[in-house]
Amino acid sequence: MAPAGGPRVKKVILERLDSGEVVVGDGGFLFTLEKRGFVKAGLWTPEAVVEYPSAVRQLHTEFLRAGADVLQTFTFSAAEDRMESKWEAVNAAACDLAQEVADGGAALVAGGICQTSLYKYHKDETRIKNIFRLQLGVFARKNVDFLIAEYFEHVEEAVWAVEVLREVGAPVAVTMCIGPEGDMHGVTPGECAVRLSRAGANIIGVNCRFGPWTSLQTMKLMKEGLRDAGLQAHLMVQCLGFHTPDCGKGGFVDLPEYPFGLEPRVATRWDIQKYAREAYNLGVRYIGGCCGFEPYHIRAIAEELAPERGFLPPASEKHGIWGSGLDMHTKPWIRARARREYWETLLPASGRPFCPSLSKPDA
C-alpha cells in the first residue's frame, strides 16, 4: 500500500464518522515542546504560539505528515483565568498556525478548551461558562472546523463546556481525563458519557492522564453506559504515550516520575499499533494521543489502520512496516528483526537494573 498521493478531500468530522471512517487525531504538544525548549513545565501554558510560532508550526507539520486527520489548536490552558491579558492573542495565533498547516492537506482544525483553574475552588457556573465563551468567540471568528472540550476531571464542568460550545452550531467533541474509577467526584465513566451525550456532545471519550490500556478500559465502560441508556455518540480516545498501570485515580500526575522522569515509560510504536487496533475493535473511530505522543506514534496509528483507511501516511515513505526496512541491514541478526512477530513479542528492557518496574503514586 502506497502513501497517499497529494491532498485528500477535506470532509467535515461528523460526515467522516457517520460513514464509519477512521479519524486519526494528532499527538501531544505540551510535553514535546517542553522537551524541545519552547514550553515551561509547571505552568503548561501555550505562549509558544506567539513566542516561537515556527516550533509550533513544525510540530503541526510533523503530525500531519505522520497521518493526523485533525490538528488541534495549541490552546491548552489558554483561557482567560490562566493567561490574563495574553489569552486572546494566544488563541488567535494558535488557530492561524493550525489552519496554515491544515491547508496543506485534508486535515480539519479543532479549537480546544480545557478545564478551568476555578472549578475546584469556585463552582461558579456563570463565571466558568463565560471563560469558555471568550475562547469560543475566537474559534468562531477563525472558523475552525469543530470544537473539542478536553482534559476534564469533573463531569459537571465538562457538561458546562459542552453546553457553551454548542452555542455556535459546530460539532462538539468532549474528552475527560478519567480512568475506570470515574471522575474526581466518583461519577462512573458510563454515567459521565450519558451526561455528556444528553448535554449535546457529538463525540465522547477520554484523553490524557492514563496509558493506552487503562484508557481503553474506560472507553469500554463509556460505551456500555451509552448503550444501556439507549444513547448514541461517536467514540474518541487520545491516551498518554506512557505506560501507567500503577497510577491511581488521578492518573500519571500522581506518579513520582511526573513530569521529568517519564522516559522509561514511553510506549513503543508497536505498543501504539496494538492500541490503535484494540480501539478500533472496541468501536472507537477517532483515535489519537495526548502527552507523550510523538509524531512516530501517530504514524503507528495510521499504519495499523491503513487497511481500513485505504492509504498510508506520507511519513511511511521513510518507515518499513513492522521493521521491514531492516532486511537491508548488513548484520544478519538485525535482518532477522525485519518481521512483525519479532516486534510484537519483544519485551523491551529499560537498561536500568536497579529501578523498579512500577512506582507508588504520591497521592
UniProtKB/Swiss-Prot annotation:
GO terms for cellular component: cytosol. GO terms for biological process: L-methionine salvage; methylation; S-adenosylmethionine metabolic process; S-methylmethionine metabolic process. Residues 11-305 form the Hcy-binding domain. It catalyses: S-methyl-L-methionine + L-homocysteine = 2 L-methionine + H(+). Pathway: Amino-acid biosynthesis; L-methionine biosynthesis via de novo pathway; L-methionine from L-homocysteine (BhmT route): step 1/1. SUPFAM superfamilies: Homocysteine S-methyltransferase (SSF82282). Binds 1 zinc ion per subunit. It comes from the Eukaryota. Signal peptide: none annotated. Keywords: Metal-binding, Methyltransferase, Transferase, Zinc. Its EC number is 2.1.1.10. One of its GO terms (molecular function) is S-methylmethionine-homocysteine S-methyltransferase activity. Its cofactor is Zn(2+). Zn(2+) binds at residues 208, 290-291. PANTHER family: BETAINE--HOMOCYSTEINE S-METHYLTRANSFERASE 1 (PTHR46120), S-METHYLMETHIONINE--HOMOCYSTEINE S-METHYLTRANSFERASE BHMT2 (PTHR46120:SF3). Involved in the regulation of homocysteine metabolism. Converts betaine and homocysteine to dimethylglycine and methionine, respectively. This reaction is also required for the irreversible oxidation of choline. Homotetramer. This is S-methylmethionine--homocysteine S-methyltransferase BHMT2. It comes from Rattus norvegicus (Rat).
